[in-house]
Amino acid sequence: AEFERTFIAIKPDGVQRGLISEIVARFERKGFSLVAIKVVIPSRPFAQKHYADLKDKPFYVGLVAYWSSGPVVAMVWEGEGVIKYGRKLIGATDPQKSEPGTIRGDLAVVNGRNIIHGSDGPETAKDEIKLWFKPEELVNYTHNAEKWIYGDN
């Protein structure tokens, strides 16, 4: 199996609404492995760094304020196709355009409060993981259920 890692964050609105276990459960049920998790309140400069690619957008200032408004659950998930599938699991950026069954489609209502972030590609995933976690915070292990998820048994 060709494993990769992705950065997933539950935004302050998702944390405040008590959606942590629901979101974690969806990634676990799919068969992905959680390799790092922590709860942080990002500083404004840290949030600016996370969204540096969007600094010219009109919504940038509000986005940074939102991200630094409360606790964020930062996670790294591992598995085959986890970046692409993680995005599918999350749903469209705008919850109104998200399919039912996706995290945003089921749990979020408006674009400005869409509860979750996921890396959009391999390079972004590497950069975001490096920004949010020290290498020693990432745990390497083989999940007991792996042979039942991927085969080869």
Curated annotation (Swiss-Prot):
Listed GO CC annotations: chloroplast thylakoid lumen
Cited InterPro entries: NDK-like_dom (IPR034907), NDK-like_dom_sf (IPR036850), Nucleoside_diP_kinase (IPR001564), Nucleoside_diP_kinase_AS (IPR023005)
Gene Ontology biological process: CTP biosynthetic process; GTP biosynthetic process; UTP biosynthetic process
Coiled-coil spans in chain: none
Cited HAMAP family: NDP_kinase
Function comment: Major role in the synthesis of nucleoside triphosphates other than ATP. The ATP gamma phosphate is transferred to the NDP beta phosphate via a ping-pong mechanism, using a phosphorylated active-site intermediate. Shows the highest specificity towards GDP.
Protein name (database record): Nucleoside diphosphate kinase 3
Species whose genome carries this gene: Spinacia oleracea (Spinach)
